[in-house]
Amino acid sequence: ELREETGYRAREWARAGVLHPVVSYSTEFIEIWFARGLMPGERRLDEGEFLDVFTASAEQLLGWCRDGQVTDAKTLIGALWLQNVRSGAWTLDWQAAPTE
């Protein structure tokens, strides 16, 4: 998904966890992953798919979450993970990306 939607490839990946956004009526789950060592490339969007790709600092993201500009659950939970990893409260198990 990272490469397809943003064009970026990652040198390393870490799986943070999984969330079930609507357990009362769905089996949907969302995996939260972190990537580092990013390298830009060409996007491969599906037909009719559109995304705005931009960069922001961790501080900007956390501020947007705090101020209510970010309201979707998956981003808020990812930001919670980010905040805890950056503070040293939680750790991630980084793995080298598979070779293509």
Predicted features, each with a name:
Residues 82-95:
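Short helix-capping/linker segments at secondary-structure and domain boundaries
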Residues 79:
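C-terminal boundary of histidine-terminating zinc-finger modules
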Residues 1-73, 92-100:
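Unchanged
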